[in-house]
């Protein structure tokens, strides 16, 4: 392992010198003066150099390609972090292609047989040794099961784990070094970025996780005319082998073939947006790797086109708080209510409570007002989120990984949608989803359902009430600090009674009794007592 790490270090050094990445590093404004001086004395900087007619982004992209698949994937992920990188570098890294030569079919067969515990002929009636596709982590072969189903077999590359461990270790070393020498680098959280990447790549190595993701996404869209997800054949899935239904569709970028079959491009573009918002606001679970290589269009019913999604190795999930953040901010943004956007961030704790709302509002207005001078149909949701993240980061907002994934996915969907149908108006398509979701969030039925989820707390309520009343009656008993109640004791007792009524409403509303009038009465009374001032 140490020998491998040393060899990788030498390889990294050679690539840095070849593409003169040291020039890029020394240009960083966050670099301390003493490190800049030390870097200027590096031995190879005194040697004759060949002239590089390349931009800094192109040099970085080529260097990552030379360093191999793990660095390529890291560059791809970095390209989505436009809240961290300059646009010219992010745009160049987006061109990184995760394509590598296939490994020998004998190794693929050997790994499949090891994982399945059976000879290839015992499982498959036919197995095509020439792979359909090959990438940095895995390659895919076509096959037919003994039972007759046409399938694809995805198999993880052999001997990949040691290389990943070595490369990740060096990325962590570089990230920690950056944090130690520069306060500006610490603000960008490089160690956190590498940690997110490590989790992504480790997750991609577990094909059972990908199978589970695909299975859930398929279940979420079962019978839907919008999206089809291939079936997983669980009997033949293992950590390093995945067997799925083979699909036959048109690559979404093959516009000529789509035109030939008279596909409705407007419907196709709008359905892509509809699929995204359905995943986000209905399911709280979304395919986070929706680049064109993973999306196909069914050949059936081109007048009502259906998408086909593959490769569910990267997915995102959202909490209620994430959904609320996204919906409220997007609605406020498109109303150009920057004050509300700023206040939402502070009230929800996304930015520190001591943040001055006027300063935050002004910063948001400065970066977003130019965007909203365009017609609504020309505005990019992804760019709006990106500008918000960039601004909020300056106010010490911790950007959650799932929101970064969502922003990247939204940019992909937007780019694809406008490639298919340039007149696509995302706001017109998305607005009904956002407004319907907001209405449902405050509907009485949803409130009752939320309380039902918390009904396990009911047994603790009486003890909590007793403890609270004891503290109210003896606020300065013993050496306990006086509680910081907002308002009078009667206000707090009213809120306590309101809480009891709300929990009671949840109890009455359990099962099929959501329409029972006592539940509605208790709900109304509880809300009144809690919210009254």
UniProtKB/Swiss-Prot annotation:
Compartments where located: Cell inner membrane
Bilayer topology annotation: Multi-pass membrane protein
EC numbers for this chain: 2.7.-.-
Pfam family membership, one: ABC1
UniProt-listed GO biological process terms: regulation of ubiquinone biosynthetic process; ubiquinone biosynthetic process
Span of domain Protein kinase: 126-494
The entry's keywords: ATP-binding, Cell inner membrane, Cell membrane, Kinase, Membrane, Nucleotide-binding, Transferase, Transmembrane, Transmembrane helix, Ubiquinone biosynthesis
GO CC, alphabetical: plasma membrane
Pathway: Cofactor biosynthesis; ubiquinone biosynthesis [regulation]
Listed PANTHER family: CHAPERONE-ACTIVITY OF BC1 COMPLEX CABC1 -RELATED, PROTEIN ACTIVITY OF BC1 COMPLEX KINASE 7, CHLOROPLASTIC
UniProt similarity note: Belongs to the ABC1 family. UbiB subfamily.
Name of the molecule in the record: Probable protein kinase UbiB
Gene: ubiB
């Amino acid at each position: 392992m140490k020998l491998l790490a040393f060899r990788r270090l030498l390889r990294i050094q050679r690539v840095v010198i070849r593409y003169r990445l040291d020039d890029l590093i020394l240009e960083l404004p966050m670099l301390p003066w003493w490190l800049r001086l030390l870097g200027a004395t590096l031995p190879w900087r005194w040697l004759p150099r060949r002239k590089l007619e390349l931009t800094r982004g192109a040099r970085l992209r080529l260097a990552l390609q030379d360093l191999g698949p793990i660095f390529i994937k890291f560059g791809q992920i970095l390209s989505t972090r436009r809240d961290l990188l300059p646009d010219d570098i992010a745009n160049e890294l987006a061109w990184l292609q995760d394509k590598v030569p296939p490994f020998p079919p004998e190794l693929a067969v050997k790994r499949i047989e090891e994982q399945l515990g059976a000879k290839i002929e015992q499982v498959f009636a036919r197995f095509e040794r020439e792979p359909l596709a090959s990438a940095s982590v895995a390659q895919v072969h076509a096959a037919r099961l003994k039972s007759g189903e046409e399938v694809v077999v995805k198999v993880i590359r052999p001997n990949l784990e040691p290389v990943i461990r070595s490369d990740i270790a060096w990325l962590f070393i570089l990230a920690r070094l950056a944090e130690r020498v520069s306060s500006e680098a610490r603000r960008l959280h490089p160690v956190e970025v590498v940690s997110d990447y490590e989790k992504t790549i480790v997750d991609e190595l577990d094909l059972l996780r990908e199978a589970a993701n695909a299975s859930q996404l398929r279940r979420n869209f079962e019978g839907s005319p919008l999206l089809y997800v291939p079936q997983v054949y669980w009997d033949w899935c293992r950590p390093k082998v995945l067997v799925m239904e083979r699909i036959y569709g048109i690559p979404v970028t093959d516009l000529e073939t789509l035109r030939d079959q008279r596909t409705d491009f407007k419907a196709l573009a709008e359905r892509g947006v509809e699929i995204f918002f359905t995943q986000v606001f209905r399911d709280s679970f979304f395919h986070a790797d929706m680049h064109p290589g993973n999306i196909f269009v069914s050949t059936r019913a081109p007048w009502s086109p259906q998408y086909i999604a593959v490769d569910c190795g990267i997915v995102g999930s959202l909490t209620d708080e994430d959904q609320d953040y996204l919906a409220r901010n997007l609605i406020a943004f498109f109303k150009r209510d920057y004050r509300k956007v700023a206040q939402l961030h502070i009230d929800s704790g996304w930015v520190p409570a001591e943040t001055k709302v006027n300063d935050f509002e002004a910063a948001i207005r400065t970066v977003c007002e130019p965007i909203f001078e365009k017609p609504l149909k020309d505005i990019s949701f992804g760019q709006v989120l990106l500008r918000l993240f960039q601004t909020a980061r300056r106010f010490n907002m911790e950007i959650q990984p799932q929101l970064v994934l969502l922003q990247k996915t939204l940019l992909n969907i937007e780019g694809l949608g406008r490639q298919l149908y340039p007149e696509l108006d995302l706001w017109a398509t998305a607005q009904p989803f956002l407004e319907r979701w907001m209405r449902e969030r405050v509907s009485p039925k949803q409130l009752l359902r939320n309380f039902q989820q918390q009904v396990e707390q009911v047994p603790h309520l009486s003890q909590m009430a007793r403890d609270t009343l004891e503290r109210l009656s003896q606020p300065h008993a013993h050496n306990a600090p006086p509680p910081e109640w907002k308002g009078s004791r009667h206000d707090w007792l009213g809120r306590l009674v309101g809480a009891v009524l709300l929990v009671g409403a949840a109890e009455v509303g359990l099962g099929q009794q959501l329409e029972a009038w006592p539940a509605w009465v208790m709900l109304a009374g509880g809300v009144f007592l809690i919210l009254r001032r």
